[in-house]
A protein has these predicted regions:
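Secretory targeting signals
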Residues: 1-37, 62-134, 172, 178
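Terminal transmembrane helical anchor/hairpin motif
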Residues: 2-14, 130, 135, 139-181
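Hydrophobic alpha-helical transmembrane segments
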Residues: 12-19, 51-62, 85, 142-152
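Helix-loop-helix units of permease transmembrane domains in multi-pass membrane transporters
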Residues: 37-71
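Perimembrane helix-loop junctions in membrane proteins
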Residues: 41, 45, 88, 92-96, ...
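Amphipathic alpha-helical recognition patches that constitute DNA-binding helices
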Residues: 47, 122, 126, 139
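Flexible domain-boundary/linker segments
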Residues: 56, 65-68, 73, 78, ...
Length: 181
């Protein structure tokens, strides 16, 4: 019974950290701060028309900016997930020094977080391009909505309102990853 309680507590910690810290917090705040202004610097400095006068299509320019954003946040999330996997595998209950069973769960959490970052990043970047002055306010409203829907999913996973949210599907993906591993 004591082993079961230790394992249940450890699993709960891993799942809660993955859901709240990775999908809800990192998944919302990284795109809000990084992808919303991917093209804003060039627009404010007045150098955007110089970049767009080069023989590269406007869509490609934005696409490469989004790919750069995804590369940076993906590497960050993967490194952070591997560090968390190492920490939780060392402090978790078990007979061996390192629990290798935690690594697939954390890699699944990283993959889910990267998908959420891609969805929010492309949404926030699009809003930032379409509404350069007021896009940040709309993105904050969307972020508050998504955060509320994420907590609604944590409290009531079967809620039909929360199924309209990216964070809901990210949290459901983490549940699937945990069940599969």
């Amino acid at each position: 019974d004591e082993n079961y309680v230790g394992e249940a507590g450890h699993r709960t910690f891993v799942i809660a950290t993955g859901k709240i810290a990775f999908v809800l917090l990192l998944g919302l705040f990284l795109p809000l701060f990084l992808s919303l202004g991917l093209v804003r610097d060039e627009t404010e400095r007045g150098t955007l028309h110089y970049l767009l006068s080069k023989p590269i299509h406007r869509g490609e320019f934005i696409f490469y900016r989004v790919l750069g954003y995804l590369a940076v946040v993906s590497v960050f999330v993967l490194i952070l997930s591997l560090v968390m996997a190492l920490i939780t595998s060392v402090i978790g209950p078990g007979d061996s020094f390192v629990r290798l069973g935690d690594f697939p769960v954390w890699l699944g959490i990283a993959f889910t977080t990267i998908l959420v970052l891609a969805a929010y990043g492309s949404l926030f970047n699009t809003i930032g391009l379409l509404l350069p002055k007021y896009g940040v306010y709309l993105c904050i409203i969307i972020g508050v909505w998504e955060f509320a829907m994420g907590f609604t999913t944590l409290i009531s996973p079967g809620s039909s309102v929360a199924s309209l949210s990216v964070s809901h599907w990210g949290l459901q993906l983490i549940d699937s990853v945990v069940l599969a591993s």
